[in-house]
């Protein structure tokens, strides 16, 4: 019989903070790839459910992520525009993005995943862990790991529709049904469109500003089948795909003065299948996946197959075998994962048919000894380009008073060079991985009904890959030093639920001592939720501190300072019946004018009205 929660169906997490479940009875698996009680998780971790997304009425994944501790975001305008996700001051390429535990196939050439392109309709759960995790997951996990779960929590059918500012429209539906006692089927589809707005404020892309609207359209389809062969054995097959078209502001090139490449078309499809075994203290899963993405940039008057168009095309193959066994008051896990990324001839920046292969073997362990909890992980990766690379991490927690813990951790992590840096026009196939060493200390507890956590961390990143304009090639030349403090708390006052977060991040270039671009030094985040006469209210406050960026519209390029801003969102929902719910939201309530990327406008005040029917 299919269980409501399958151990290896999807990686799930919890946290000792207000952005996550804090039940000591919850079981989680993300932190170390094995099942463990939530109160033994030593890394700072957050989880967002589908109910949270609907309460916040978020229309993009980026809007969800910006609310979480340690996260800073930057975007070249509105929905669908290019974006960056910074976790604890690290580069956007230093965050590992997983979908159902599998690496998102979007970073093969550019090196980082753009979450503005991932459809929020696919998201049923987001699980987010901060700090180094390369010893568990391999490359990219320097700043943290974001795992997007697409599996619905329960059976049912949902139809939804919404409209809003800038011509926003959304229509979708999903259903999950159990057939007999052993088979479950899920189907979903979604369509999103917005006319958008003119994103460039002053031509910071190096040319004259385009006075046009920069819209976005997405079409998504999803299907999954799960079957339990016995009480111990089960299997699944799952597939999804999406097509995105985004208009953005570009500039006329001196080489092609009659061509304006200002449209992006992304096609992505993913298929995966797996077999699970769960028998008491031993758990195992064998999983394989295939994904294929084609990312065009072109002049819409000439088409995406014109010689002036560019293409990033990546195929990705994954095989994972994970195992865990309960031992004493803890668990031991071990596994192997294999990945191959390949490009087709003609792919942007990469002129030849190339591929990268990586095989990783890892070991994890957690054990509780009285008031002490110890965990550790070690991993060895064998990469076809740069050979072997090892990482490790360890953490220890001491519950010095009941309900209060001190946690100390240290870990190493790395980021492998991407295909563009290795094999592109300016590539260097002698590049080494970027490497990180991180320390963190934290106190957490429950005081007078307030669940809180305060942590301080330092992250030294060496061998950063940068482009040398004189030599016209990529080299391992950069270094970054990041120091920060993170504090979260959650509590109730009568019918009001409060969640508060504060982030201080000092992220600097170690050679020049300059602050890294687009990272706010301070952020304050506050979430208030309540119910009044069956109306569910959600009020969000976000203070985004001053940041620095580069003005590419000047020569030579100059650093510019972007001022801080206070943003308020208000969302309300009302259950008309037990099946029908209507929702409304005002984002940027006071219509603040600000930028997260210099020279690119944000949306201003926006309104959305939506409804869902569930049966």
Swiss-Prot record:
Domain of life: Bacteria
Main subcellular localisation: membrane
Locus of motif TonB C-terminal box: 598-615
Cellular component terms per the entry's GO annotation: cell outer membrane; pore complex
Keyword flag Calcium: yes
GO biological process, one term: monoatomic ion transport
HAMAP family assigned: BtuB (MF_01531)
PANTHER family: COLICIN I RECEPTOR-RELATED (PTHR30069:SF53), TONB-DEPENDENT OUTER MEMBRANE RECEPTOR (PTHR30069)
Annotated protein name in UniProt: Vitamin B12 transporter BtuB
Organism of derivation: Enterobacter sp. (strain 638)
């Amino acid at each position: 019989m299919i269980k409501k929660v399958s151990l290896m169906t999807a990686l799930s997490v919890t946290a000792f903070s207000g952005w996550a479940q804090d039940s000591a009875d919850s079981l989680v698996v993300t932190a170390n790839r094995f099942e463990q009680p939530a109160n033994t998780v030593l890394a700072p971790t957050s989880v967002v459910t589908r109910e949270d997304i609907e309460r916040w009425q978020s229309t993009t994944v980026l809007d969800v992520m910006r609310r979480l501790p340690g996260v800073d975001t930057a975007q070249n305008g509105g929905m669908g525009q290019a974006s960056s996700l910074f976790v604890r001051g690290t580069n956007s390429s230093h965050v590992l993005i997983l979908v159902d535990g599998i690496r998102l196939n979007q970073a093969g050439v550019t090196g980082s995943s753009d979450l503005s392109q991932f459809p929020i309709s696919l998201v049923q759960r987001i699980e987010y862990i901060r700090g180094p995790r390369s010893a568990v997951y391999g490359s990219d996990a320097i700043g943290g790991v974001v795992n997007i779960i697409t599996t619905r929590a329960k059976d049912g059918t949902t139809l939804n529709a919404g409209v809003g500012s800038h011509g926003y429209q959304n229509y979708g539906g999903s259903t999950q049904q159990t057939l007999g006692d052993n088979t479950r089927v899920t189907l979903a589809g979604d369509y999103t469109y917005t006319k958008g707005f003119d994103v460039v404020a002053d031509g910071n892309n190096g040319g004259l500003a385009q006075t046009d609207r920069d819209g976005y359209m997405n079409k998504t389809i999803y299907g999954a089948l799960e079957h339990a062969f016995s009480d111990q054995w089960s299997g699944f097959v799952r597939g999804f795909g999406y097509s995105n078209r985004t208009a953005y502001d570009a500039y006329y090139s001196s080489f092609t003065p009659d061509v304006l490449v200002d449209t992006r078309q992304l096609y992505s499809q993913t298929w995966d299948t797996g077999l699970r075994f769960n028998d008491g203290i031993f758990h195992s899963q064998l999983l394989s996946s295939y994904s294929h993405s084609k990312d065009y940039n072109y002049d819409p008057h000439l088409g995406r197959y014109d010689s002036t168009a560019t293409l990033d095309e990546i195929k990705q193959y994954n095989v994972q075998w994970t195992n865990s066994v309960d031992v004493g008051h803890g668990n031991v896990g071990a596994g192997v994962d294999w990945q191959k990324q390949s490009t087709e001839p003609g792919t942007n920046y990469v002129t030849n048919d190339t591929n990268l292969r990586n095989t990783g073997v890892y070991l994890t362990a957690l054990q509780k000894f009285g008031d002490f909890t110890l965990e550790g992980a070690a991993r060895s990766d064998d990469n076809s380009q740069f050979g072997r690379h090892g990482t490790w991490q360890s953490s220890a927690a001491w519950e010095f008073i009941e309900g209060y813990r001190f946690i100390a951790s240290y870990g190493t992590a790395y980021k492998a060079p991407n295909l563009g840096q290795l094999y592109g026009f300016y590539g260097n196939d002698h590049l080494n991985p970027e490497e990180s060493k991180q320390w963190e200390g934290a106190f957490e507890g429950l005081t007078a009904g307030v669940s809180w956590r305060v942590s301080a961390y330092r992250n030294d990143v060496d061998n950063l890959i940068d482009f040398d304009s004189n030599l016209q090639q990529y080299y391992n030349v950069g270094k970054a030093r990041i120091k920060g403090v993170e504090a979260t708390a959650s509590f109730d006052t009568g019918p009001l639920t409060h969640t508060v977060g504060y982030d201080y991040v000092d992220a600097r270039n170690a050679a020049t001592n300059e602050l890294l671009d687009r990272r706010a030094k301070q952020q304050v985040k506050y979430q208030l939720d309540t119910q009044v006469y069956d109306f569910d209210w959600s009020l969000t406050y976000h203070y985004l501190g001053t940041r620095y960026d580069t003005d590419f519209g000047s020569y030579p390029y100059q650093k510019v300072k972007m001022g801080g801003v206070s943003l308020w969102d208000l969302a309300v929902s009302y259950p008309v019946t037990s099946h029908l719910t209507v929702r409304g939201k005002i984002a940027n309530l006071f219509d603040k004018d600000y930028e997260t990327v210099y020279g690119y406008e944000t949306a201003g005040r926006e309104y959305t009205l939506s409804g869902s029917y569930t049966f």
